[in-house]
């Protein structure tokens, strides 16, 4: 165990030692993720999505939940973008870490903060709601775990692809409002996948309700899917679309 821990410590670069900025960023992820999960789960509870896991939600209920998640994601990502990047999501954090945009230590701290925040939000909601049913992400009736996995991969891929295009690509013309626009793809994906998998796209968003209710049925789908889709989107965008120079300038005398 000691050797394993030493290898783990050695795997972190020296410039990853937490500083004041890192601590602030982790605290921002804690607060922002708490608010996002609290808003999303409470909206789902208020909208009446408390049927049996796997039951299809009426379109009005699904739309209400999607709008709440879209607004919360857009506003909170914008609010925290200048502090922590406004990840709110382990899939975003891991995807950016794999592509080298954040350090490994910061990624670990972010994910820990996100999971803690989600858990606290859902436990508090159970207390504040008087024990109302906490909706958990579940596969729709007739949807196999593998089908759900692929759906979560695709939904998370689209989320991260849009993030790269609007925020990380230096050629983007909407970087200033990119975080706010991110909420639109969250809402669209929630409508598209809500009755298939619940459209998690976010392991932290799924973790809190599962912990609060003790319902871990097919919970792995909501980890593996997003954690595959996020890095895949980064790889595809950076490999095919994130071109540093559109063309090389001609030298004098060349035609």
UniProtKB/Swiss-Prot annotation:
Q: How does it sit in the membrane?
A: Multi-pass membrane protein
Q: For the motif NPA 1, give the residue ranges.
A: 89-91
Q: Which gene encodes it?
A: TIP4-1
The UniProt similarity line reads: Belongs to the MIP/aquaporin (TC 1.A.8) family. TIP (TC 1.A.8.10) subfamily.
Q: Where is this motif: NPA 2?
A: 202-204
Question: What's in the GO CC field?
Answer: membrane; vacuolar membrane
Q: What GO MF terms are annotated?
A: water channel activity
Sorted alphabetically, the keyword list is:
Membrane, Repeat, Transmembrane, Transmembrane helix, Transport, Vacuole
User: What is the role of this chain?
Assistant: Aquaporins facilitate the transport of water and small neutral solutes across cell membranes.
- Report the domain of life of the source organism: Eukaryota
Q: Please give a single GO biological process term from the UniProt record.
A: water transport
Recorded hits in PANTHER family, A to Z, give: AQUAPORIN TIP4-1-RELATED (PTHR45665:SF13), AQUAPORIN-8 (PTHR45665)
Matches recorded under PROSITE patterns: MIP
| Major localization listed first in the record, in broad terms | membrane
Which SUPFAM superfamilies does its entry note? Answer: Aquaporin-like
Q: What is this protein called?
A: Aquaporin TIP4-1
Which InterPro entries does the protein's record reference?
A: Aquaporin-like (IPR023271), Aquaporin_transptr (IPR034294), MIP (IPR000425), MIP_CS (IPR022357)
The domain-related comment in the record is:
Aquaporins contain two tandem repeats each containing three membrane-spanning domains and a pore-forming loop with the signature motif Asn-Pro-Ala (NPA).
Positions of transmembrane segments? 25-45, 61-81, 108-128, 148-168, 176-196, 223-243
Asked whether the keyword Repeat is assigned, the reply is yes
